[in-house]
A protein has these predicted regions:
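N-terminal active-site segment of His-dependent metallophosphoesterases
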Residues: 1-69, 73
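His/Asp/Glu-rich metal-coordinating catalytic cores
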Residues: 49, 58-153
Length: 153
C-alpha cells in the first residue's frame, strides 16, 4: 500500500511575523500549489491514501473559500483517500461538519467528498486490507481502542 504522510501544512496562515502582506499572500499561494501537486502526484502514482497528521489549516477560523478549495481538490482526486486529523491549530471542527454546528461545508452543492476521511472522536479507524489507520489525540488515549496484533496499526 502506498501512503503519503504529511503534517503541519498550515494552509491560510497569516504569516505576519516576517512577511509583508503581499509576500504572505504569495507564500500562501505557493503552499496551496504544493498541496495540489501532492494530490496530483498521489493520483498519478496510485497512492492509496494521503494522511495529514494535524494542522492542514493554520486556524480553526480560516477562510471558508480556502477550505472549499481544499474540498474541491480532494473531490478532484477520487482514487486517493484523504485522511485528515485535526491538530492544535485547525481544531476539532475541521470542516464544520458536526451535526450541532449548524453549517456543513459542501462542494458545488454536494456533501463532503467520499474520499475525505476524518477522525471524529476517539478511535475512528479506516481499514485497507490488513493495514489499519486510527486517528486519535495522544493526550486523550481512549480505553475503547482495540488494536489487533495481526494488523499493521
Amino acid at each position: 500500500m502506498k501512503l503519503i504522510h504529511c503534517a503541519d501544512i498550515h494552509l491560510d496562515s497569516a504569516l505576519a511575523t516576517s512577511l509583508t502582506r503581499q509576500e504572505a499572500r504569495r507564500r500562501n499561494d505557493e503552499l496551496f500549489e504544493t498541496f495540489i501537486k501532492m494530490m496530483d502526484y498521489a493520483q498519478r502514482e496510485k497512492v492509496r491514501a494521503v494522511l495529514v497528521a494535524g494542522d492542514l489549516f493554520d486556524s480553526e477560523n480560516g477562510r471558508e473559500a480556502v477550505r472549499k478549495k481544499v474540498l474541491e481538490a480532494v473531490a478532484a482526486h477520487p482514487q486517493v483517500d484523504f485522511l485528515v486529523l485535526s491538530g492544535n491549530h485547525d481544531g476539532e471542527q475541521l470542516f464544520n461538519t458536526a451535526p450541532d454546528s449548524g453549517f456543513n461545508m459542501t462542494v458545488n452543492g454536494n456533501s463532503l467528498p467520499k474520499n475525505l476521511k476524518l477522525f471524529p472522536g476517539a478511535g475512528k479507524a479506516y481499514r485497507y486490507g490488513n493495514v489499519v489507520i486510527t486517528g486519535l489525540n495522544s493526550l486523550k488515549l481512549p480505553s475503547n481502542l482495540h488494536l489487533k496484533p495481526e494488523d499493521t496499526n
